[in-house]
Amino acid sequence: LTKNIDKIKGIVLTHGHEDHIGALPYILKQINVPVFGTLLTLGLLENKLREHKMLDSTTRHTVVPGEKVKLGQMVVEFIHTNHSIADAVALAIHTPVGVVVHTGDFKVDYTPIDGDVIDLQRFAALGKEGVLLLMSDSTNAERRGFTMSEKNVGKVFEKIFEETPKNRIMVATFSSNIHRIQQVINAAYMYGRKVAIIGRSMVNAVKTASELDYLWIPPRTLIDINETRNYRDDQLVIITTGSQGETMSALSRIASGEHKQINVKPDDKIIISASAIPGNEKSISRVVNELLKKGANVVYGDIEDIHVSGHARQEELKLMLALTKPKFFMPVHGEFMHLSCHKNLAISMGMDKNDIFVMKLGEVLEVNKNEAKVTGTVPVGQI
């Protein structure tokens, strides 16, 4: 990137998850170009820029779904999607040789928490106009069927809250999953409980989302963690970080007895509302075991359906292919096995295998109106 800095017109974000925005403060220190993203995405990014004392030195442009931004010879169009974070978008990149659609991380949720369904009509319209290349999320390409709606988790929360009338409830989830946090708050409000937030990233995310009106917190529901001592256990819900067993997270410190404000009590109901990111299984098991040894009642994915994925399964991926009808297809966002599975899915729908490109890291795909081909490589690896 630094070698081609004169060619870079801007950085375009699809959503505010850590793996999509976490490196930006470091990149922007060397390549200071405008950043484009939706309101919540930029709000979460600004928390990071503030920590790096870079707020004043970076240019940020807020976009809304449906908006188009001209960058050099290309026009980038933002399309509303559903994901495990609010304000996610796909990109339709209008180039001189044709339209490239990048789905970003997405799922098709017909009953999303905010009521805003993925803009399937726009994908279909682009398909009719002609899509040169589709780049589509492959994370769940191995999984059959459809991904469940986020609303399903809310129903499980309500069931667990109803079954826990006397004990304190803690919920660990990803701090960026605003819709999941909203459902915890909804259940707490329904059962007359106060909500306290712990974990730096969780506190920041809740503050940002509520200030930008992506999170509705009923009046007198949110309390400071230090106020919890003034309430009975049956009046409390604590939302925390640490769903992946991260060593320094709030839940890990609670489990090890090192948290300054919260200690585990016998029969605390602790809900881990997330699936294990590959590689984190041992860390999560360690935390669960410690909590169980202290007498807590721990609920996780193998016990209740308290998590749904933010990524499309096979039927949703087939729908995206059917709507956009791309001339060429490049599966993205997944390991090689996920990309290969996505390729086979496209072949099963009638695409020519020669028009599908499963790329290795660093390979360059060159596309024009008539053909697509791998033309070389660029250096990749740890920095």
Q: What residue spans do the PLM features occupy?
A:
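His/Asp/Glu-rich metal-coordinating catalytic cores
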Residues: L1-V12, H17-N230, S249-N263, K282-R286
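Hard-cation-handling environments
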Residues: R143-I383
